[in-house]
Amino acid sequence: MAFVKRDNKNKKRFQQQNPLFKRKRFCRFTVAGVEQIDYKDLDTLKDFIGDNGKITPARLTGTKAHYQRQLDTAIKRARFLALMPYTDLHKN
């Protein structure tokens, strides 16, 4: 089996053309300098919930573990207080 050697120039071009190429993820909360995630900030929390109503995992969003735990707790509190729906069946 033959292997094709790519130099850096071709590698960069290949990554940009590849539809599966994703940009490097970063933690939004670290960049913004957030200390505590608030359960009342629904606009931020909605960004971390998928179409089906599930909490998006940190490996997909790039959120650090410290903030992912806070995010998880904040979403659960908002759901408990009926600020957010538990499932996608409840449209706003």
From Swiss-Prot:
Top-level division of the source organism's lineage: Bacteria
Alphabetic keyword roster: Ribonucleoprotein, Ribosomal protein, RNA-binding, rRNA-binding
Name of the featured protein: Small ribosomal subunit protein bS18
Highest classification ranks of the organism: Bacteria, Pseudomonadati, Pseudomonadota, Betaproteobacteria, Burkholderiales
Assembly and binders: Part of the 30S ribosomal subunit. Forms a tight heterodimer with protein bS6.
One annotated Gene Ontology cellular component of this protein: cytosolic small ribosomal subunit
Family classification: Belongs to the bacterial ribosomal protein bS18 family.
Keyword Protein biosynthesis listed: no
Database matches in NCBIfam families: S18 (TIGR00165)
UniProt xrefs under InterPro entries: Ribosomal_bS18, Ribosomal_bS18_CS, Ribosomal_bS18_sf
Gene Ontology MF term list: small ribosomal subunit rRNA binding; structural constituent of ribosome
Pfam families: Ribosomal_S18
PROSITE patterns membership: RIBOSOMAL_S18
GO process terms (BP): translation
Function: Binds as a heterodimer with protein bS6 to the central domain of the 16S rRNA, where it helps stabilize the platform of the 30S subunit.
